[in-house]
Amino acid sequence: TAWTFLKAMQKCSKKREARGSREAPETNFPDTTEESAQQICCTRDSSDSKSVPRSERNKKGIQCQGEGSSRGSQPGQFVGVTYNLEKRPTTIVLINDTPLNVLLDTGADTSVLTTAHYNRLKYRGRKYQGTGIIGVGGNVETFSTPVTIKKKGRHIKTRMLVADIPVTILGRDILQDLGAKLVLAQLSKEIKFRKIELKEGTMGPKIPQWPLTKEKLEGAKEIVQRLLSEGKISEASDNNPYNSPIFVIKKRSGKWRLLQDLRELNKTVQVGTEISRGLPHPGGLIKCKHMTVLDIGDAYFTIPLDPEFRPYTAFTIPSINHQEPDKRYVWNCLPQGFVLSPYIYQKTLQEILQPFRERYPEVQLYQYMDDLFVGSNGSKKQHKELIIELRAILLEEGFETPDDKLQEVPPYSWLGYQLCPENWKVQKMQLDMVKNPTLNDVQKLMGNITWMSSGVPGLTVKHIAATTKGCLELNQKVIWTEEAQKELEENNEKIKNAQGLQYYNPEEEMLCEVEITKNYEATYVIKQSQGILWAGKKIMKANKGWSTVKNLMLLLQHVATESITRVGKCPTFKVPFTKEQVMWEMQKGWYYSWLPEIVYTHQVVHDDWRMKLVEEPTSGITIYTDGGKQNGEGIAAYVTSNGRTKQKRLGPVTHQVAERMAIQMALEDTRDKQVNIVTDSYYCWKNITEGLGLEGPQSPWWPIIQNIREKEIVYFAWVPGHKGICGNQLADEAAKIKEEIMLAYQGTQIKEKRDEDAGFDLCVPYDIMIPVSDTKIIPTDVKIQVPPNSFGWVTGKSSMAKQGLLINGGIIDEGYTGEIQVICTNIGKSNIKLIEGQKFAQLIILQHHSNSRQPWDENKISQRGDKGFGSTGVFWVENIQEAQDEHENWHTSPKILARNYKIPLTVAKQITQECPHCTKQGSGPAGCVMRSPNHWQADCTHLDNKIILTFVESNSGYIHATLLSKENALCTSLAILEWARLFSPKSLHTDNGTNFVAEPVVNLLKFLKIAHTTGIPYHPESQGIVERANRTLKEKIQSHRDNTQTLEAALQLALITCNKGRESMGGQTPWEVFITNQAQVIHEKLLLQQAQSSKKFCFYKIPGEHDWKGPTRVLWKGDGAVVVNDEGKGIIAVPLTRTKLLIKPN
């Protein structure tokens, strides 16, 4: 080891002592304060410094840092050198402009110059009285002399002792002024590395390094030099092909920080189970007398990385203008940003702390990442000894706990909370909102409120959350409402007045009090006798159609799980509803497998009306309700069992609103206390019996709820709309009586007249010129439904008759539903010009009694059809059975049924709603994705423990799927070959699954010339097409499982249903769209070949000649030139700029 122990006896003056112990300026130190290293600065003040035993110095090594950087360990170097103390740490410095080889001795308080070196100085100063120093050979006489020391651009003037000793020593006084520091390398040799493996079929990242600016490059080199000297990185081997790019950012302190983009490496690593599933909560801490919070410094850089895995972490330091070859390094310790660094660190620290936990089971020791909490109930001295022992255990393994982050007095900052011996709080935070907030700003605000709600009871976010509706982009501006601002101010007031919360007492029971706010948010507090332990909130899912009791029962399960997680015990619940309501919810056979202990209050929530609903018919009156909508007008009606009928015109409402209003009318008009309501609206029946949630007076369902409250019992039943039920048919007819009183029409070219005028005006669809004696048929987009016992008459207008325009429109009977065409003849003496929008004819409705017509039925197609006068149609009723059979076999969609069997869409939808499998369908995820012919998406899904690989063409929605025996590269490659054989794909988009990014699959797609993309390059929902296809395919498979013996057979039947039994673009099936696209591609190729193969001729001019030649046949045409056979020069190429192409001459 180095000779470093000359004990200097300080007898010099206080002035010299002060001069020798002064701290070097902070700006003169190299930037070694990054998170990647822990450094110990040497000072002369022995009271503030800690001695480092020789044994530890032998392990850790010494590093001196100043300005500049270099590599190696020759005596001429000084900065960025690591000494392992196998030989003396020496360097060359200029003393009085004389180069001298000196020993660096951090154990010496004072620097000493040898007599020989003193005699070699180019110039020497005066001699002053020195002090005696005690060395190995006894007391040594000295004198002092002023010197000037230069090293790496640093100049210092001081005094040195001169003595007859073997070697010149630079002690701590001069080393400190030169900017040297003692750095203890923290890569622990005591900790065993953990094995890291790559996923099967993957390889390490090979991403090139992007350029860095000169300023960032200098910062990176400085950091890398320090990491290299500390042993945290090493030079990469010459045969290492891997690389992940680095970038450098400047911190607020102005110092650089080096980061590495390890995202591609993280994708290839085999990741285990997460062992840290959440943050510890102060409400679960047991109250203790003494607390201490510690922070572990540079935790990742203490743990060694698996040597076999280190090559995959390689990175590159480039140079400006390629001045020198790039320098490449690999990590020896856990790098920041690596997916397994948190797991390995926490697991390693857990094993280190386990003996301490077993030795002191009564001590609360919480470990989360690099934050430690220690709580005990012993004496203050005993607690301090525990902390010393714990820090020693960590230090022995290489983990340091810096003094500046050691919290021994309250309040303690821990994981965003403020701890005191008697209570705890959320760290104070003022909730603010910018003037024009974006979606990102509001989301951050909501996150802060949610975080603080556990420590500040009563915080709400309903109105703030409402401002984000309809916003998709993070930078999209939101409309900040007055309600949201008021809610924010109320939350700030609650935060300002918040009191400290208590710690858990294991000797007492806990009580959870649940309340519902005016904003329909459920808030709760967990209490003991000493006060509130923690609080929380949950927005009730009213929009999900869940009842209040169902919401609160879910909340109880959530709170019970949260409480068991934090303290290992479930509280007793005090809830704002009655026991009867809970029992009613339980009787519905819902999902509750466990019910906590509940204390019921007298408060009754809004959905007490549900107690009036029964499962069996009552002895009271039965009312059949129905609602409909056509031509923008809604009709609500009902028929009672005693023959009473009522209809009501609702105006422009939806069909569902009409159904709901019919039920409301029936309940309002019935005075009976026991009522049976029968509806054909599955939507209304499902909502009333199960779906309605927290409904207030502003809800459209509130009148129905209020009327149910006034009854004793109410029975609701649902029947399909076309099952031949007498009462339902009567209600259906009643809903049409009001509708048929007036003319029903569609179109934009029909205008209503004044109240005192008869009929309607018809308008010209576009500008038309009618010559003299010419007859034209003018089409319109007007369709009408003539009332019963009436007919329509198209005739002219007096204003047009003056100009000589004769209208021969004709009679429209009540069976015709096609578009109206008007026959016009110019009998005048000049041409007549009709302008778009001009009123040129009129339609008058007249009654007649010559024909006996049946009442209007919206579910009937005209006998004439829609092709004009004289055409005939067919009734669709006889096709219902065939459509039902079709749907039972193939689960065809409503639009395809309506198109194939010529039945109304409403009837087709009713057939679909009756199917128990198809009623479960919902809408898939929405979003903009890349769609084009022959662009496919692929994904693997699982059903019945089997793997299904799904391909879906993004343009048509055509699905191809196959079963895989294993989800690996080989099986995926075989499936891709089969897919490529059947189709002609140009591109494929998948996720980052191991089977899709495996090297064999990537190479196969390259060989097939299929462009392959992964991840989310186009949109965060770029997998939306195939995910939606997977869900649809699974639903169709389940629909066919009853009729098949194997999953393979059900899969093939489901593919037929998905591709040929549901609508896609423009009402066509995916199969029809796909075939049409392929035919179009083939047609375009044939046209291109035909165009290229056709004979072309041209005139041409040879460069250097003035006369045009030709015409002659073009032998070949390229993008920039043509090839012709010139009479004089033979076959030559002529630029297109000197040619004139033409068709074959006669």
Swiss-Prot record:
Domain Peptidase A2, residue spans: 100-174
Entry PTM: Specific enzymatic cleavages in vivo yield mature proteins.
Domain (Reverse transcriptase): residue spans on this chain: 230-419
Enzyme active site: 105
Keyword NADP: no
Assigned EC number: 3.4.23.-, 2.7.7.49, 3.1.26.13, 3.1.13.2
RNase H type-1 domain boundaries: 617-740
InterPro entries: Aspartic_peptidase_AS, DNA/RNA_pol_sf, dUTPase-like, dUTPase-like_sf, dUTPase_trimeric, Integrase-like_N, Integrase_C_dom_sf_retrovir, Integrase_C_retrovir
Chemical reaction(s) catalysed: Endohydrolysis of RNA in RNA/DNA hybrids. Three different cleavage modes: 1. sequence-specific internal cleavage of RNA. Human immunodeficiency virus type 1 and Moloney murine leukemia virus enzymes prefer to cleave the RNA strand one nucleotide away from the RNA-DNA junction. 2. RNA 5'-end directed cleavage 13-19 nucleotides from the RNA end. 3. DNA 3'-end directed cleavage 15-20 nucleotides away from the primer terminus; 3'-end directed exonucleolytic cleavage of viral RNA-DNA hybrid; DNA(n) + a 2'-deoxyribonucleoside 5'-triphosphate = DNA(n+1) + diphosphate
Residue span(s) of domain Integrase catalytic: 921-1078
Molecular function GO labels: aspartic-type endopeptidase activity; DNA binding; dUTP diphosphatase activity; exoribonuclease H activity; magnesium ion binding; RNA stem-loop binding; RNA-directed DNA polymerase activity; RNA-DNA hybrid ribonuclease activity
CDD domains in the cross-refs: Rnase_HI_RT_non_LTR (cd09276), trimeric_dUTPase (cd07557)
Region of interest: Disordered: 13-77
Alphabetical UniProt keywords: Aspartyl protease, Cleavage on pair of basic residues, DNA integration, DNA recombination, DNA-binding, Endonuclease, Hydrolase, Metal-binding, Multifunctional enzyme, Nuclease, Nucleotidyltransferase, Protease, RNA-directed DNA polymerase, Transferase, Viral genome integration, Virus entry into host cell, Zinc, Zinc-finger
UniProt feature, compositional bias: Basic and acidic residues: 45-59
GO biological process, one term: establishment of integrated proviral latency
DNA-binding annotation, residue ranges on this chain: 1096-1144
Binding site for Zn(2+): 887, 891, 915, 918
Source superkingdom: Viruses
Keyword Transmembrane applies: no
Composition bias type Polar residues, residue spans: 29-41, 66-76
Zinc finger (Integrase-type): 878-919
Protein family: Belongs to the retroviral Pol polyprotein family.
Function of the molecule: During replicative cycle of retroviruses, the reverse-transcribed viral DNA is integrated into the host chromosome by the viral integrase enzyme. RNase H activity is associated with the reverse transcriptase.
Record PANTHER family: ENDOGENOUS RETROVIRUS GROUP K MEMBER POL PROTEIN, RNA-DIRECTED DNA POLYMERASE-RELATED
UniProt protein name: Pol polyprotein
Gene of this entry: pol
